[in-house]
Amino acid sequence: MSPKVTKEHKDKRQAEILEAAKTVFKRKGFELTTMKDVVEESGFSRGGVYLYFSSTEEMFRRIIETGLDEGLRKLDKSAEHQSVWASISSYLDELTEGLRDVADTLAPVQFEYLVTAWRNEERRQYLEKRYDLFVERFSRLLQKGIDQGEFQPVQPLATIAKFFLNMNDGIIQNALYFDEEKADVSGLAESAKLYLKTVLQADEK
């Protein structure tokens, strides 16, 4: 009888494999990364990797899901200790700082994955679900601001959430494609704040 593997061990092994996958994705991009690459990077056996993940797509989706969930949970947690507006404003400030070395992040790989989704219906549907999840979660955060008397929005919350996501992605794309001056990440982040402050009629008191 084989020894029982604990959940903690499984979680740890999966996390180690995903870290190896991130390294390869950043080095080679999504399309060119193979399972063999991840196996070699991880140092585990082929069977040891396939036990947890059947493809690089499954790995990348797990990475996307974890990143999105962590980001939204961080926003929610921040809003427990300060106003919703302050939490969103702080997020945009952190985004500006985090994009100084954007080429060394997974952002380029995520855009590569997104660009090819229109040709793959299953992938498009998957991304649509993630999009809907973000809109639902961010709208819920905005509703909390309304309930606390911070906001009096002049557009539907879902529309504001969708536009916020578009602004967020646009800022990241600028940082990827252009030099620091032309990308104007800090200026765009301030413009995003101005839009949100106006459309939400935010009370910063």
From Swiss-Prot:
User: What does the record give as the DNA-binding region?
Assistant: 34-53
Q: Which GO terms describe its biological process?
A: regulation of DNA-templated transcription
GO molecular function terms here?
DNA-binding transcription factor activity; transcription cis-regulatory region binding
List, for all copies, the residue spans of the domain called HTH tetR-type.
11-71
The family database entries (SUPFAM superfamilies) matched by this protein are listed as: Homeodomain-like, Tetracyclin repressor-like, C-terminal domain
Q: What InterPro entries does the database record attribute to this sequence?
A: Homeodomain-like_sf, HTH_TetR, Tet_transcr_reg_TetR-rel_C_sf, YfiR_C
Keyword set, alphabetical order? DNA-binding, Repressor, Transcription, Transcription regulation
Record's superkingdom? Bacteria
**Disulfide-bonded cysteines:** none
* Transmembrane portions of the chain: none
Q: What is this protein called?
A: Uncharacterized HTH-type transcriptional regulator YfiR
The gene name on file is: yfiR
